[in-house]
């Protein structure tokens, strides 16, 4: 019989069949009873006969692309000049004041200056596409920009959960706005959400290392032999 912490590990069993059954029930319900799922899985426009003389007033992408579509629409000339430019300047100052290596400072300042110059020289449509692509690619930088000394959220400061919670809410709001027709208030919210989305990742090297972390038990640490 295992003892102490090891016994707890054996008690915490994962029932794979239960999880698979729940997934198959939900999957089958959608496939057989609601394949269009309110127009989000299969868009209503796909069921309308094509009319070459008439363009639909509003075209929205599939639901899993809508957050990034909101980023695309949020990038306007005003957003680049009055939102992103001040943010990038403050970001460069933060790097200059905290980075240890001179090469990091030089690369950051050069990149910020190049981006700001590009905002003035290239139209916003181009930067909208760049922003949409960057919103996807920035997810792959997580292993390098997360400077937390522990991996599990269980041992991180409590306010880190609030940061992740705000990010999830922002992502869902961007997804909702992506399926709605554009209007002034929605565009403003999308701009705020876009700025918060990128700030979450760009500031992660700092905020992920802040706070009081709990000590990690020996049973969950790996020591190479």
Segments (PLM) and residue ranges:
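Membrane-interfacial catalytic/cofactor-binding modules of polytopic membrane enzymes
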Residues: 37-82, 117-121, 125, 129
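Membrane-interface capping segments at transmembrane-helix boundaries
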Residues: 145-148, 205-219
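Hydrophobic alpha-helical membrane-insertion segments
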Residues: 21-47, 170
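Single conserved hydrophobic/aromatic residue that forms the stacking wall/gate
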Residues: 1-6, 10
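Small-residue-rich transmembrane alpha-helices that serve as helix-helix interface/gating elements
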Residues: 189-201
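Hydrophobic membrane-spanning alpha-helices of multi-pass integral membrane proteins
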Residues: 57, 61-62, 84-95, 106-115, ...
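Alpha-helical transmembrane segments and their helix-start/interface "positive-inside/aromatic belt" motifs
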Residues: 11-26, 105-110, 156-164
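Alpha-helical transmembrane segments
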Residues: 97-101, 141-157, 179-184
């Amino acid at each position: 019989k295992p003892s102490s912490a090891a016994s707890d590990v054996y008690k915490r069993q994962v029932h794979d069949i239960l999880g698979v059954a729940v997934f198959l029930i939900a999957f089958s319900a959608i496939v057989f009873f609601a394949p269009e799922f309110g127009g989000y899985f299969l868009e209503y426009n796909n069921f309308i006969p094509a009319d070459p003389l008439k363009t639909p007033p509003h075209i929205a992408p599939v639901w899993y692309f809508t957050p990034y579509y909101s980023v695309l629409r949020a990038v306007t000339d005003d957003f680049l000049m009055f939102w992103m430019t001040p943010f990038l300047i403050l970001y460069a100052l933060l790097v200059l004041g905290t980075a240890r290596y001179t090469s990091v400072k030089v690369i950051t300042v050069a990149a910020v200056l190049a981006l700001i110059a590009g905002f003035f020289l290239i139209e916003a449509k181009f930067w909208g596409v760049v922003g949409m692509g960057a919103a996807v690619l920035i997810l792959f930088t997580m292993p390098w920009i997360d400077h937390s000394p522990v991996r599990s959220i269980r041992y991180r400061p409590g306010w880190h959960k609030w940061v992740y919670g705000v990010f999830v809410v922002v992502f869902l709001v961007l997804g909702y706005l992506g399926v709605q027709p554009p209007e002034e208030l929605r565009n403003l919210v999308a701009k705020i959400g876009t700025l918060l989305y990128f700030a979450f990742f760009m500031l992660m090297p700092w905020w992920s290392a802040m706070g009081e972390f709990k000590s990690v038990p020996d049973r969950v640490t790996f020591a190479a032999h």
